[in-house]
Amino acid sequence: MAEMQDYKQSLKYETFSYLPPMNAERIRAQIKYAIAQGWSPGIEHVEVKNSMNQYWYMWKLPFFGEQNVDNVLAEIEACRSAYPTHQVKLVAYDNYAQSLGLAFVVYRGN
């Protein structure tokens, strides 16, 4: 009989969770794509122990009309600095469809 092994897994929050972790260049490309689609970026964060809850805290308001990727990246870093143990997620709101166009975790916390 085969020996049973522990199946190592991590929590999956969105589609990109199944891919290797994103580097800064790939995160920048996703933000650029969201802005090019006309979506409004926003940042959410939550404690790691509560990360499977439906509600994540908003970091400020969504950045309606934001066209500068660097401003969004700066806000992600500000959120990460303010809450170093929290998970930080980028969301992009599609105003036309009134739904999320994009959402992924950019920082998994400590």
From Swiss-Prot:
Induction context: Produced when grown in air or in air supplemented with 5% CO(2). Part of the ccbL-ccbS operon.
Keyword Repeat: no
Recorded phenotype for the gene knockout or disruption: A double ccbL-ccbS deletion does not grow in air, grows well with 5% CO(2), a high-CO(2) requiring phenotype (hcr) and forms empty but otherwise normal appearing carboxysomes. Required for growth in ambient air.
Record keywords: Bacterial microcompartment, Calvin cycle, Carbon dioxide fixation, Carboxysome
A GO-annotated cellular component: carboxysome
Role description: RuBisCO catalyzes two reactions: the carboxylation of D-ribulose 1,5-bisphosphate, the primary event in carbon dioxide fixation, as well as the oxidative fragmentation of the pentose substrate. Both reactions occur simultaneously and in competition at the same active site. There are estimated to be 270 RuBisCO heterohexadecamers per carboxysome.
Name of the protein described by the UniProt record: Ribulose bisphosphate carboxylase small subunit
Gene behind the chain: cbbS
